Swiss-Prot record:
It comes from the Eukaryota. GO terms for biological process: microtubule cytoskeleton organization. This is Calcium-binding protein SPEC 2D. Ca(2+) 1 binds at D23, N25, D27, N29. Signal peptide: none annotated. It comes from Strongylocentrotus purpuratus (Purple sea urchin). Ca(2+) 3 binds at D121, D125, K127, E132. Keywords: Calcium, Metal-binding, Repeat. Ca(2+) 2 binds at D84, D86, K90, D95. Calcium-binding protein involved in larval development and metamorphosis. Likely to function as calcium buffers mediating the transport of calcium from the sea water to the blastocoel where calcium is required for skeleton formation. The gene is SPEC2D. Found in cell lineages giving rise to the aboral ectoderm, a squamous epithelium covering the surface of the late stage embryo and larva.
């Protein structure tokens, strides 16, 4: 799972503890109606639209892998916005993508970053949109 490469073991344990607080039946999921509070417990606020979409997609429950994916999605968006220095075109250059990936994982190699960028095949003149960045990170293994 990509989360193991992008979150430290301590972070995963912390997120699991937060998740377990909402998994009151100890059955590996919690009702999606608690997702907003669960995300807030790890420092992320979901918009009303994100909550509504999650309720539709998750069909009533949220598992730990889904919870980690939502945290990762929020983290990707935060990193993207921090790295998009000019904020005019809402795109990251290859160098900004490299810096963003290093902010996720200090152990990642330049070769791995280059490979990821090449595989992502950004259609915007070699630049990466927010959606492309999130997809690239989610596929990172």
């Amino acid at each position: 799972m990509a989360a193991n490469l992008l979150f430290s073991e301590d972070q995963i344990k912390e997120y699991k503890t937060k998740f377990d607080a909402f998994d009151r039946n100890n059955d590996g999921n919690f009702p999606t109606m608690f997702l907003g509070n669960a995300m807030k417990s790890v420092g992320h606020v979901l918009t009303a639209a994100e909550l509504e979409n999650s309720r539709r997609v998750r069909k009533g429950t949220t598992t730990f892998p889904q919870f980690l994916a939502m945290i990762l999605d929020k983290k990707c968006r935060k990193v993207f916005k921090a790295m998009d220095k000019d904020d005019k075109d809402k795109l990251l250059s290859a160098d900004e993508v490299r810096q963003a990936m290093l902010s996720f994982d200090r152990q990642i190699t330049e070769d791995k970053i280059k490979e990821m960028i090449e595989k992502a095949d950004f259609p915007n003149d070699g630049k990466c949109s927010l959606e492309e960045f999130v997809k690239m990170v989610m596929n990172f293994c």
